[in-house]
UniProtKB/Swiss-Prot annotation:
Record bears the keyword ATP-binding: no
Annotated segments matching region Disordered: 1-31, 326-348
Annotated keywords: DNA-binding, Metal-binding, Nucleus, Transcription, Transcription regulation, Zinc
The organism's taxonomic lineage, starting at the top: Eukaryota, Fungi, Dikarya, Ascomycota, Pezizomycotina
DNA-binding residues (ranges): 36-63
Location in the cell: Nucleus
Pfam families the UniProt entry points to: AflR, Zn_clus
CDD domains assigned to the protein according to its UniProt record, in alphabetical order: GAL4
Superkingdom of the organism of origin: Eukaryota
Record InterPro entries: AflR, OAF3, Zn2-C6_fun-type_DNA-bd_sf, Zn2Cys6_DnaBD
Protein name: Pestheic acid cluster transcriptional regulator 2
Bias kind Polar residues: ranges: 1-22, 331-348
Gene Ontology MF terms: DNA binding; DNA-binding transcription factor activity, RNA polymerase II-specific; zinc ion binding
SMART domains linked to this entry: GAL4
Organism: Pestalotiopsis fici (strain W106-1 / CGMCC3.15140)
């Protein structure tokens, strides 16, 4: 069916006309299955006799041959595709009819409306001819502006190259080397953005109160990085620690022997905080050395043990307590027994020697409390050293079993003395010093 539009003289074909003569292939004859339904259900071989097979005849049941399902597209899917095609054609035709019947706009009406709207801005903007006259009447007398350039003033201006280098950070230069005091209100506006108004101040601005340094996190690899930064061997570092502590101990001993006349020898040394901080650094450094393969040498462990003994002596000297000597028979014995030392301790701990202990706020009491809180670090280092010594002994035993004589025949620095005995003497010395400090605090 065709419809004619009187305005556009177009011919539209309706969907019914498109479906009037569908082209369909001729129906094909149905093909029967080779097996009957009974044999196919029983999953047995069918002899394919028609109209009744021998098996169905023997069993006395009805033999039925159903139609064979042709492989490929199903009939219902084909019908569904045809329906979708018809619906799409109907939608396309409806859209075409809607576009043809839509009324055409009247541009004459819109032009008049636009002209009316433009008349509203007629009084706002100045006409071009009047604008040109106004520009010609406006003149500037540049003679009124006297620009004086004094060479001395120009020379006193800051060099821009130095300012540029101040804000450009070198890849190798640390960020904390920039001095905040060189930044003035007239320089680096982008850096000073967000700070208080300083237009009426001519002095330099101190940015130290505004710049916050982010806290540095201690990563697990910081200890390994610390070892890599120290280029000296672990043995050299341990010997340097021993030399440093020997000088400190000698200096304190000389001061206690000579002493200045008229001074109170029982006052707290001024460097107690420095002694505690330095001992912490040394203990941490020796703990890091134990993580290196150099600590497999017992000679290094013995030197570290002597350093730990020097640290205990330094703590005891800081609070004027004579350190307890090692026990008889050890590798570091000084031929002085603990029995000879106990009367001296009782004499030093008496209130007659320290009359200021009765006040409870004397410097020696505060020093004793500070030292007592640091002894656990020495104890932890001794435990790590003992564990390392056991690991080295196990490695030597395995080396002797495997025939590695270079490992098994290693002779320590202190011949005839194992690190275990030295570690036991150090623990005795540490325990004795702890008891003396506790007794001193209780006697106060």
């Amino acid at each position: 069916m065709e419809a004619a539009d009187p305005n556009n003289n177009l011919t539209i074909t309706s969907p019914s006309t498109l479906l009037s003569n569908p082209t369909q292939p001729p129906a094909q004859p149905l093909k029967l299955r080779d097996s009957c339904h009974a044999c196919a259900s029983s999953k047995v071989k069918c002899h394919k006799e028609k109209p009744t097979c021998s098996r169905c005849r023997k069993r006395g049941i009805t033999c039925e041959y159903f139609a064979h399902r042709r492989p490929g597209r199903k009939q219902e899917n084909r019908a569904k595709d045809t329906t979708n095609h018809v619906e799409r054609q109907e939608n396309t035709t409806a859209v075409e009819m809607l576009d043809l019947n839509w009324p055409a706009p009247d541009f004459s009406t819109q032009t008049s409306i636009a002209n009316d709207n433009l008349d509203v801005f007629h009084d706002i903007f100045v006409p071009p001819d009047q604008l040109n006259n106004g520009l010609t009447d406006f003149t500037i007398d540049f003679d009124d502006f006297d620009i004086q350039s004094d060479p001395a003033e120009i020379a006193s201006l800051p060099d821009t190259s130095s300012l540029e280098s101040m804000f450009v950070t070198s890849p190798t230069a640390p960020t904390d080397t920039i001095t905040p005091n060189v930044i003035t209100p007239n320089v680096g506006l982008s850096v000073l953005e967000g700070l208080p108004d300083t237009t009426h101040h001519t002095q330099a601005i101190n940015l130290a109160s505004y710049i916050q340094t982010p806290p540095t996190e201690k990563t697990p690899d910081s200890r390994i990085k610390h070892l890599e930064e120290n280029k000296d061997p672990c043995m050299t570092r341990a010997l340097s620690f021993l030399t440093q502590l020997s000088e400190s101990t000698s200096r304190i001993c000389k001061t206690s022997e000579t002493g200045c006349s008229g001074t109170n020898k029982k006052s707290l040394p001024e460097s107690l905080d420095g002694i505690i901080a330095e001992n912490r650094r040394l203990l941490e450094a020796m703990s890091n050395i134990l993580q290196c393969r150099c600590s497999e040498d017992d000679d290094l462990l013995c030197i570290q043990a002597i350093v730990a003994s020097k640290i205990l002596n330094l703590y005891a000297s800081a609070i004027e307590i004579k350190p307890s000597p090692a026990r008889v028979g050890s590798g570091v014995s000084t031929h002085t027994t603990a029995g000879q030392y106990e009367p001296q301790v009782e004499q030093q701990l008496s209130t007659r020697t320290h009359p200021q202990l009765a006040s409870g706020r004397d410097p020696i009491r505060m020093a004793a409390q500070s030292v007592l809180g640091e002894l656990h670090r020495v104890q932890r280092l001794l435990s790590q050293m003992l564990q390392k010594s056991k690991d080295n002994e196990t490695m030597r035993r395995k080396g002797s079993e495997n025939g590695l004589r270079a490992v098994a025949d290693k002779v320590p620095l202190t011949s005839g003395v194992s690190f275990g005995s030295i570690e036991a003497d150090l623990r005795y010395k540490l325990g004795k010093l702890s008891i003396e400090i506790i007794t001193l605090l209780r006697g106060a």
